[in-house]
Amino acid sequence: LPENVFAYDLRVNLQTGNWNILAEYAQKQQDPNEWNDYIYRKGYVAMLSTSYSKSGMSMLVQAKRSDNMGYRSMRRLPLSAQNTSYINHLPAFTMDHTYALAAHYPYATNPDGEWAYQAELTYNFKRRTLLGGKYGTKVKVNFSHVHSIEQNPHTLDNGMVQGSNGYGSAFWKWGDSKYYQDLNVQVEKKLLKDFKLNLMYMNQYYNKTAVEGH
């Protein structure tokens, strides 16, 4: 097994006017461990994020593909410590909920690999308009979708996956499993000087078997 695992990250951030574009690519070298069945496939994450903002409106569109990017300081851990020893952080491209019911099933990035997308639009209707009313109205729409990546198994001559490159994966192709999907519409409306109304519609899909393994 490799004694050291080299990793690097490249990031480019462009900003012009009201636009901001962020592109990032990270890769780790061969890192066989118990979570990837001791395969020698390299891991990587490619991410693109675009945002636009002006007075009263903002927009965000993101896409990310990760592949075999679980990265820990230990190759094996006891069952009581399976969620420890992470070196890298893989943020989820999903909305961070604050209300208890909506936050009941938070999503965590699948280190084996995934395609993740997120889009968000926020708009403030001005005061003293038909939809803004006396105090204005804020509307936010968020949509996120996370899907597995295609994985075509590679094996050694003896049929074993361990010690091989693990699998092949075409960059743009999805796998068979949808991990998570979330649609949220939020309306924030101030009715009186000291009284505000918050309304939210949520449609959430959570694949517990794929995400939690049970």
Each model region followed by its residue ranges:
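Exposed, low-structure sequence patches enriched in small/polar residues
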Residues: P2-H214
